Amino acid sequence: MKLIESIEEMQSTAINARQAGKTVALVPTMGYLHAGHASLMDEGRKRADILVASIFVNPTQFGAGEDFNTYPRDLEKDKLIAKAAGVDYIFAPKASDMYPTGYQTYVNVEKLTRPLCGASRPGHFRGVTTVVAKLFNIVMPHLALFGKKDFQQLTVIRRMAADLNMTVQIVGMPIVRESDGLAMSSRNAYLSQAERQSALCLSLALQSVRGAFRSGERSVEALRKLALDIINAEAFAVIDYVEFYHEATLTEVEQADDRTLVALAVKIGKTRLIDNCVLGED
């Protein structure tokens, strides 16, 4: 496994791989890797000849007062996890190279970025789509793998790739959870022991909603109340949103069906966590 920091070296490596007839898979990350990231890498390893993991805490997707400066970083540990997952190259560019002096070009997906996290984190998705577009141009992957925990992000990136005629295949992978149900996230490291216990309200709320749906409940109003009651019972929890959307269009629905996305964003103490499920999926 090789660590590459230079954009030019990563591009030339990708060009050489493609010219040799090899397929390239990319797993974009912000580092502080966990088993969720490893599952993406494992899948990429199966599907491609060359596996690249990018590690870049992208400043343009953090807003004022967010956690860019405190976001957890541990490159040495990340290298061990990536190597164990069969990564060939870690691409870890410097922010000053990705956004040099005079940089002024951004990629913006319009409608899909307005609800959910886009409403509470203005500018976030513009930063995400810009950095992902840049990574696609640098790494030139045949496929790129993203986790479904960031469901809106996955939907937005798919839209960007389609709208801009990018040839990269976007692969969405299932959420990886801790043994007690908490969705794996680098931000879980912020949680105190008590907050960590409180954070289970997200997955418990989703389980309750899914159970009621499978028992025949279709009213979004009733299903939302189930989720709200569970989350509001936790002392540390402050709800950002509990929403029911069509999974493909991210438009609100009043009656739930198999393609309804249940999306949650909840602050546990100072830590903002997200989780989701699609009601028709296991």
Swiss-Prot record:
Disulfide bonds: none annotated. It catalyses: (R)-pantoate + beta-alanine + ATP = (R)-pantothenate + AMP + diphosphate + H(+). Pathway: Cofactor biosynthesis; (R)-pantothenate biosynthesis; (R)-pantothenate from (R)-pantoate and beta-alanine: step 1/1. Beta-alanine binds at Q61. SUPFAM superfamilies: Nucleotidylyl transferase. The active site is at H37 (proton donor). Its EC number is 6.3.2.1. This is Pantothenate synthetase. The lineage of its organism: Bacteria, Pseudomonadati, Thermodesulfobacteriota, Desulfuromonadia, Geobacterales. The gene is panC.
